[in-house]
């Protein structure tokens, strides 16, 4: 059974390195950082100009047990109540080149 998960961690800009350090300390072997903009229900405006919230998305493919550990630590160290305002979730990974040698491909 494939237990790999695509772990997404969304934080305010400038906090991705801290998240990668947390993830590595708990078993992640790598991550991709994606620059993004946030959208909120009540956008901030200055002089009539809407200000976008700069975000970073840290994406890492890890085993489920590692994902759960990372999520807990991010919640503690960089969660919604912190300046990083971190949010985490994971999705199942059906197949990747990381696991293709372990499972035969069926037509």
Predicted features and spans:
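Positively charged, small/polar-rich N-terminal and surface patches that mediate targeting and assembly
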Residues: 1-107
């Amino acid at each position: 059974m494939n237990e790999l998960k695509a772990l997404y961690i969304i934080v305010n800009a400038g906090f991705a390195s801290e998240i990668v350090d947390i993830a590595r300390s708990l078993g992640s072997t790598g991550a991709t950082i994606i620059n993004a903009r946030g959208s909120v229900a009540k956008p901030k405006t200055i002089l009539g100009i809407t200000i976008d919230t700069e975000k970073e998305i840290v994406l890492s493919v890890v085993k489920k047990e590692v994902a759960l550990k990372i999520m807990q630590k991010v919640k503690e160290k960089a969660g919604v109540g912190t300046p990083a305002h971190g949010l985490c979730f994971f999705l199942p990974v059906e197949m990747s080149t990381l696991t293709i040698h372990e499972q035969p491909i069926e037509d």
